[in-house]
Amino acid sequence: MARILGVDIPNNKRVVISLTYIFGIGKSRSQEILSKAKIDENKKVSALSEEELATIRKIASEYVIEGDLRREVAMNIKRLMEIGSYRGIRHRRNLPVRGQRTKCNARTRKGPRKTVANKKIETK
């Protein structure tokens, strides 16, 4: 496996697909990196030379990816929570942020149901 920016990318796949294993690089950015490096997208990672891998590393290091990007996203969410915006409050309460309904569904964000004891009213 080739190692680019601290991430092992698979040898048996095409370069354009393998680069998407790096957090922050999708298909379009992968194509952009390969066009700048003048490398064929259909080439397998195992067929790349060390010079080609070095150029990919150099070009990819210009972008905000992996740990820096994760940190930036976390800081953006933290900032929203600190300023008390609507989105920040939704993050703090672990509710859907983008306007989804919560009366039913939203189980992924809310987590498993919290059952309330003694809710049934006994009839006499």
UniProtKB/Swiss-Prot annotation:
Keyword tRNA-binding listed: yes
Gene Ontology MF terms: rRNA binding; structural constituent of ribosome; tRNA binding
GO cellular-component term (any): cytosol
Domain of life from the UniProt record: Bacteria
SUPFAM superfamilies the UniProt entry points to: S13-like H2TH domain
Record-level GO BP terms: translation
Region of interest (Disordered), ranges: 103-124
Pfam families: Ribosomal_S13
Sequence ranges of Basic residues compositional bias: 103-117
Keywords noted in UniProt: Ribonucleoprotein, Ribosomal protein, RNA-binding, rRNA-binding, tRNA-binding
The keyword Ribosomal protein is annotated on this UniProt entry: yes
Subunit structure: Part of the 30S ribosomal subunit. Forms a loose heterodimer with protein S19. Forms two bridges to the 50S subunit in the 70S ribosome.
Family annotation (NCBIfam families): uS13_bact (TIGR03631)
PANTHER family: 30S RIBOSOMAL PROTEIN S13/40S RIBOSOMAL PROTEIN S18, SMALL RIBOSOMAL SUBUNIT PROTEIN US13M
HAMAP family membership: Ribosomal_uS13 (MF_01315)
Its biological purpose: Located at the top of the head of the 30S subunit, it contacts several helices of the 16S rRNA. In the 70S ribosome it contacts the 23S rRNA (bridge B1a) and protein L5 of the 50S subunit (bridge B1b), connecting the 2 subunits; these bridges are implicated in subunit movement. Contacts the tRNAs in the A and P-sites.
Family under the similarity heading: Belongs to the universal ribosomal protein uS13 family.
Protein name, entry field: Small ribosomal subunit protein uS13
Lineage of the organism: Bacteria, Bacillati, Mycoplasmatota, Mycoplasmoidales, Mycoplasmoidaceae
